[in-house]
């Protein structure tokens, strides 16, 4: 199985890099895992709706350029479906069981994802109504993917 996270912007925080590296190392026993960063669009502090759409569209083009046709795409979005860790684990297992070998998660920029990205997605996942930095979501998502594999293995990691 191949699992990819496509995310907007460069990760600078060392503590987040260290956490992600640890979970990526653990995930290597279960899947090929990679994170692809696409550049974020520079934007002033206050944007009109049209300017926000333009920023999301430009970032969306960069994201979609990294997505292959055969990939099952899950976008992280506030409007997405919230799942318990066990449900998330079952969905990953079911995708693998029924022939999906490439899963791509998308974390948009600070303004979210474009309509084109949302339309390309096969599913939308939400971690709740909280607003979290998209850089932090990389670590949270990577840990949850690892947790899903551990749940599917029957490991005591998930208590």
Curated annotation (Swiss-Prot):
GO terms for cellular component: cytoplasm. Its EC number is 2.1.1.177. Keywords: Cytoplasm, Methyltransferase, rRNA processing, S-adenosyl-L-methionine, Transferase. It is found in: Cytoplasm. It catalyses: pseudouridine(1915) in 23S rRNA + S-adenosyl-L-methionine = N(3)-methylpseudouridine(1915) in 23S rRNA + S-adenosyl-L-homocysteine + H(+). Belongs to the RNA methyltransferase RlmH family. Specifically methylates the pseudouridine at position 1915 (m3Psi1915) in 23S rRNA. This is Ribosomal RNA large subunit methyltransferase H.
